[in-house]
């Protein structure tokens, strides 16, 4: 675990919460862009029937992948790949991984990079910019 100046773990918590929110948004946006709003609504219902509310999509992404794979077969990998690539782009990083690379590892690496480098997603009005000034 990274220790921030003055032991400020609230910065880490804020970054992790924002990361998870951003990942969930990337997932929903990817499904909507690729499959349309009607299918997106069905995917949300499918996840909720399996005990995964929208707020838990990122924290339970492994389960989301299993559910999608069960429902869509191997084509679910396209949704997962596009979601992870979109997440990297949201943090202004080039997705330098292939379709068959371990996407779970790529998400974990990005999460750690976000925390260690205090990265902010492009479309997040929820992060107070003062954390970037105070902790660098």
Where do the PLM segments sit?
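Long, compositionally biased intrinsically disordered regulatory segments in eukaryotic proteins
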Residues: 1-136
């Amino acid at each position: 675990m990274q220790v921030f100046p003055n032991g400020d773990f609230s910065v880490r918590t804020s970054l992790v919460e924002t990361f998870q929110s951003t990942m969930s948004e990337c997932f929903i946006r990817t499904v909507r862009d690729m499959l349309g709003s009607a299918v997106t609504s069905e995917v949300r219902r499918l996840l909720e029937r399996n005990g995964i509310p929208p707020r838990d999509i990122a924290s339970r992404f492994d389960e989301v992948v299993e559910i999608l794979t069960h429902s869509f077969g191997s084509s679910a990998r396209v949704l997962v790949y596009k979601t992870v690539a979109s997440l990297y782009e949201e943090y202004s990083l080039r997705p330098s991984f292939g379709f068959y690379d371990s996407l779970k590892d790529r998400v974990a690496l990005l999460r750690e990079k976000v925390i260690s480098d205090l990265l902010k997603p492009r479309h997040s009005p929820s992060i107070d910019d003062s954390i970037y000034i105070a902790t660098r």
